């Protein structure tokens, strides 16, 4: 309700919503949330892995292709399946218990299912896991092998998978930030009490 009130208090936002959805648009919280979601889905960072998926067989070098094979053969692709290399719901601790599971209050949904995180730009998003207890990508790969695959991945396999994961590093787009509308007399002010 508060979000709707703020957005509706700014004529520039109303104009933008009418431009996007038509002059009879009803600005609701759901529409605002959907609009933000649509915007977020445009924030992609294409990588050499995407180039490879789009048919450029030379986009991945030999070591990255070897890492892809290891990633698939080890079973990582069982959960990291879609173009974003994540996104499905799966159990955590399938074949073992995450060594830092008791740190933090994360439990998953009512069935213990967790959303598999994307691996895009994974080399740039440490620390890892729900509680940020693992800082090394190699250690995260090794831990996932144990708790999700029941596998003691060799140092060679871990290094190979890590090389492949570097192929997920996206090219950052040039971002031109929009000028946000100024608040008006009708815009609710923060409650500082």
Where are these regions (language model features)?
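C-terminal capping alpha-helices of c-type cytochrome domains
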Residues: 5-19, 23-47, 133-193
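Short glycine/threonine-rich turn/loop motifs
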Residues: 48-143, 149-152, 163, 176-193
């Amino acid at each position: 309700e508060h979000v709707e009130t703020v957005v509706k208090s700014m004529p520039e936002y109303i104009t933008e919503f009418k431009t996007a959805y038509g002059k009879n648009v009803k600005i609701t919280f759901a529409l605002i949330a959907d609009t933000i979601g649509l915007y977020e889905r445009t924030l992609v960072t294409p990588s050499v892995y995407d180039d490879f998926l789009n048919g450029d067989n030379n986009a991945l070098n030999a070591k990255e292709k070897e890492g892809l094979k290891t990633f698939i053969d080890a079973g990582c692709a069982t959960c990291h399946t879609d173009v974003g290399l994540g996104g499905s719901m799966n159990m955590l601790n399938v074949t073992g218990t995450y060594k830092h599971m008791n740190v933090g209050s994360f439990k998953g949904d009512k069935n213990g299912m967790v959303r598999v995180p994307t691996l895009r730009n994974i080399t740039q998003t440490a620390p890892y896991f729900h509680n940020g207890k693992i800082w090394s990508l190699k250690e995260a790969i090794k831990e996932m092998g144990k708790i999700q695959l029941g596998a003691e991945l060799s140092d060679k396999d871990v290094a190979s998978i890590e090389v492949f994961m570097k192929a997920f590093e996206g090219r950052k787009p040039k971002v031109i930030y929009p000028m946000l509308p100024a608040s008006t007399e009708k815009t609710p002010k923060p409650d500082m009490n």
